[in-house]
Swiss-Prot record:
The organism's taxonomic lineage, starting at the top: Bacteria, Pseudomonadati, Pseudomonadota, Alphaproteobacteria, Hyphomicrobiales
Signal peptide per UniProt: none
Keywords: ATP-binding, Cell inner membrane, Cell membrane, Cytochrome c-type biogenesis, Membrane, Nucleotide-binding, Translocase, Transport
Gene Ontology cellular component list: plasma membrane
Listed name of the protein: Cytochrome c biogenesis ATP-binding export protein CcmA
Role description: Part of the ABC transporter complex CcmAB involved in the biogenesis of c-type cytochromes; once thought to export heme, this seems not to be the case, but its exact role is uncertain. Responsible for energy coupling to the transport system.
Subunit structure: The complex is composed of two ATP-binding proteins (CcmA) and two transmembrane proteins (CcmB).
Length: 200
């Protein structure tokens, strides 16, 4: 599987964010997108996820599931946790599994993996920032998708949480998955750098 972009142009609010961007990533590879604030790191992830439309150029997936669109093969995890505060941990995860569709895996096992199996009944409003991030990460495990698009994925995670997530990413890559992450911090796994907008 290979994800590639050729001469990609991103325009937001009438402003050109970047132009002529080329990139590629293959199965088993992690790419860390780096650059200054406002250089377009998040915009690139949103373009790949189908949440924005390129103003020019192409983004294509070769070797994925031919019956699914590129966005349908992507997990997009934004820098905000996208949780409903009044819903419990289990209910939030169930909501996302229903919304995403596709092959659904064991939710309790996903919560156990991220260290939240003891808190399934708690409303998300009662979780710490680190716990909310762990719950967001559990989405990646509950519905199987080969491409993970991650925006500042380790935000609010303590050292133990970062180590846990590093293990999840390595497992995903070992199964032939692909990761593109916009980050200001080291991912904690082997990755190739894609720099946007000159020196960060």
């Amino acid at each position: 599987m290979q994800l590639s972009g050729r001469r990609v142009i991103c325009v937001r609010g009438g402003r050109e964010v970047f132009a002529g961007l080329d990139f590629e990533a293959v199965s088993g590879e992690a790419v860390a997108v780096v650059g200054r604030n406002g250089s377009g790191k998040t915009s690139l992830l949103r373009l790949i996820a189908g949440l924005l439309i390129p103003a020019g150029g192409t983004i294509a997936l070769d070797g994925g599931d031919a019956e699914l669109t590129l966005p349908e093969q992507c997990h997009y995890l934004g820098h905000r946790d996208a949780l409903k505060p009044a819903l419990s941990v289990a209910e939030n995860l169930s909501f996302w599994a229903d919304f995403l569709g596709g092959e659904r895996l064991d939710a309790h096992e996903s919560l156990a993996t991220v260290g939240l199996d003891h808190a399934t009944h708690l409303p998300a409003a009662f979780l710490s920032a680190g716990q909310r991030r762990r719950l967001s990460l559990a989405r990646l495990l509950t519905v199987r998708r080969p491409i993970w698009l991650l925006d500042e994925p380790t935000t609010a995670l303590d050292v133990a949480g970062q180590d846990m997530f590093g293990g999840l990413m390595r497992d995903h890559l070992a199964r032939g998955g692909l990761i593109i992450a916009a980050t200001h911090m080291a991912l904690g796994i082997d990755s190739r750098e894609l720099r946007i907008g000159g020196v960060a």
